[in-house]
Structures are given as C-alpha cells and as structure tokens.
Design a protein with these regions (language model features):
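Short aromatic-glycine-(Arg/Gly/Cys) micro-motifs in beta-strand/loop hairpins
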Residues: 58-84, 160-186, 215
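Intrinsically disordered, low-complexity segments enriched in Gly and acidic/Ser/Thr residues
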Residues: 139-198
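Long, low-complexity, intrinsically disordered segments
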Residues: 223-235
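Internal, hydrophobic cores of structured domains that mediate oligomerization or house catalytic pockets
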Residues: 49-50, 56-127
C-alpha cells in the first residue's frame, strides 16, 4: 500500500472548532503531530457528521517507552453551524483503540486494520483475547504501559487495573510480542492480585504467566466506554 493511503482525512475543510478550548486541544493533541500520524483505520458516516480513526503516531518511537503509539480519534461535526468537536485517547494496543471507538458508535466493520498495515495475530489465543478486549474494555483502566523496540522482536507490556473493586485478580498484565520476521504478533494475559506482583513477574519471568482464575474469567461485563489511558503524552 502506498504511504499516501495511510494519510488521515479529517474532512474539516470549511469547519471551525466549536470553542477556543476545542481549537487549543485539537492543535496540541492532533494538528502538531499530523505529519507523523498514519491512519490504520478511518471511517466517515454517510451524513458527514462523524469520523472515526485509529492513528499510528510514528513519532512515538523517538519518545519515551511509556508514550502511546496509537491514537483513537472521534470527530463530531455540526454541518449547520460549520463547527466541530472531538475526543481522542492515546492507547498502547490496537484492540483497546478498537474498543474505545466501538463505544462511541463506530461500526465494528470499520475498525479493522487497513490492508497491508500492521501485523497479523499469530494464533487463536491472540485472536480470542483481542476480541475480548474489544468487547469488554470497561473492566479495566490502564495503570501503565511501555513499548520496547528491537529486532527481530518488539514487545509491549500493558498493566490493567480492574474498575470493580471487588473483582478477583484485579490486575491484568497484557504482553504483546511482535515478530518482525513473520509480521505476526502474539498477545498473552496474566492475572494478579496486586500491581507489585504483576510488575515482579514482568521483571523476573522465571515462572509461567499466571492465568485468570475460572471465577474471574467467567464474568460477562457490560460493554465498555473504552479503556482509560495511563498518564503519558497528552492526547
């Protein structure tokens, strides 16, 4: 796919920000990074009122490991007033960005990766876990994340904290390993009682990642409003 096919089309010609605050936030969160943003998914509603994007911030590789590589963006236009508002969130995993958009009524068929972009799931376990994250992201907020670049593999670790205080094993560690030779990625989940236990396992890794206990994995929460991102570069 030519690089031009990844260019996000914001469709804001003839529109003005709905307020000074919207103008400042759009400039600081989106416009100043526009040259570094590649669209992995974008969808515009037929009535022209809404647009949805999953954007890859290519400049994140030069930042801190905690910088979020993906930006989920929802633009809402008022054609009568010729103004727009927006929401955006920096997120570490594609499935979490999908979840954020789906809960803002983006069609599920519109959040798949653009052909030729990104990597493919390495196995059925990865596919199932990504589907669960898309559908039930409101179980957790993001406590921390980091991404490490390298070759032939790259790794992203995300620590999630359960939003239900009574939830068993409230901390979940997501570990995504990308193989740049095969252009595939593997995603695994570990369940922990505390954040310290999750981070200790991540540092040591001498034992298998602890799986969620059956009682926790059988819970079927309502669909999310999208995961809450960890602190990092503001989006």
């Amino acid at each position: 796919m030519p690089s031009s096919d990844y260019e996000p089309v914001f469709c804001l010609e003839g529109y003005q920000p709905a307020s000074v605050q919207v103008a400042d936030q759009f400039r600081d969160r989106i416009a100043v990074y526009e040259a570094d943003l590649n669209a992995l998914a974008q969808h515009h509603t037929p009535d022209g009122r809404q647009s949805f994007f999953i954007l890859h911030d290519t400049s994140a590789v030069f930042g801190l490991p905690i910088d979020m590589p993906l930006v989920a963006l929802h633009i809402t236009r008022d054609p009568e007033a010729r103004t727009f508002t927006f929401e955006s969130e920096g997120l570490p995993l594609y499935a979490l960005a999908q979840s954020w958009l789906l809960q803002r009524h983006c069609p599920a068929s519109a959040v798949g990766r653009a052909e030729g972009s990104g990597t493919d799931p390495a196995d059925e376990t990865t596919i199932a876990l990504e589907q669960r994250l898309r559908d039930h992201g409101n179980q957790f907020s993001i406590a921390m994340s980091y991404s490490g670049d390298g070759y032939p593999t790259q790794e992203t670790a995300v620590l999630l904290k359960g939003t239900d205080r009574g939830q068993p094993q409230p901390y979940r560690l997501l570990l995504e390993t990308t193989d740049l030779r095969t252009f595939t990625h593997q995603l695994r989940e570990g369940a922990f009682d505390t954040a310290d236990a999750a981070l200790a396992w991540l540092e040591d890794r001498s034992t298998p990642m602890p799986k969620p206990r059956p009682a926790a994995s059988q819970q079927l929460p309502v669909k999310p409003a999208g995961p809450v991102a960890a602190p990092g570069r503001a989006r």
